[in-house]
Design a protein with these regions (language model features):
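Terminal-region recognition feature
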Residues: 1-217, 221-228, 232-237, 241-243
Length: 243
């Protein structure tokens, strides 16, 4: 089995695990079918019995996509919550790497740099219109879950992280560039140390209410005050499965 086939098989195994995690025993027949087809393909690949590897692999991919599309149409509210909170869910770094043409992560000063749950980056969007090339710098601010990384606290930001977000909103206003915020949080981190979680969220809201640059927010998981801290925007968007 070549490395490319092995990589794709690992991806299919991850997708099957994801389906099991989301539906928790429901749709057992569909899950069993996917498992059987995946095991059959793996066995043939290991024994070198694939007559047309590309065609058979594409057929297996199509089967996975068909089952996933069918299951997605019957999602319950709790299943949507599991999707939003799953470690394989897209995170802010994935967006930075795949949506923006270039980005540089920046940190705060002193205690404002202590919270890895809040990610700030200067990013660039490049678009072509006819023969002209347009470059737009933006300030990207959002909670980072890191696909379940424990040190990210599940996207629950402490007051220092929200203070860092507020600081760079002001920087964006000074430079006259738009602010893009991404909300991936179940809520603010429950802590009452100075400057206080609720007090810092209030400062952020006050700051955003007066910003003189456009603010666009994209919501995946918008829980409680953690979402409010960076969610006051001129335009709000939500992912197809989000709340």
């Amino acid at each position: 089995m070549d490395n490319l086939t092995q990589k794709r098989l690992n991806g299919l195994r991850d997708r099957l695990t994801y389906i099991r995690d989301i539906f928790l025993g429901k749709h057992a027949d569909s899950v069993k079918l996917l498992q059987e087809k995946l095991d059959e393909f793996t066995d043939k690949a290991n024994r070198g019995l694939l007559q047309n590897p590309y065609a058979e692999e594409s057929s297996l991919e199509d089967l996975f996509k068909y089952v996933e599309d069918r299951l997605t149409k019957t999602l319950t509210p709790m299943e949507k919550v599991r999707i939003v909170r799953h470690p394989q869910r897209i995170c802010l770094k994935d967006i930075l790497e795949n949506v923006y043409d270039n980005f540089t992560e920046v940190g705060g000063q002193d205690e404002h740099s202590l919270d890895p749950s809040m990610l700030i980056a200067r990013a660039v969007i490049i678009r072509r219109r006819g023969k002209k090339r347009y470059t737009q710098s933006v300030m990207v601010i959002g909670q980072e879950k890191g696909h379940g990384a424990e040190f990210r606290n599940g996207g629950s930001v402490k007051p220092w992280g929200n203070a860092k977000a507020r600081q760079f909103m002001r920087v964006a206003e000074t430079e006259g560039i738009p602010v893009h915020t991404y909300i991936f949080t179940p809520g603010s981190y429950p802590i009452e140390d100075y400057p206080g979680a609720a007090q810092q969220i209030a400062r952020n809201i006050y700051c955003m209410a007066g910003l003189r640059v456009p603010v666009v927010t994209v919501i995946s998981e918008g829980g409680s005050g953690g979402a409010l801290a960076i969610g006051l925007a001129d335009k709000r968007l939500m992912l197809s499965v989000g709340y």
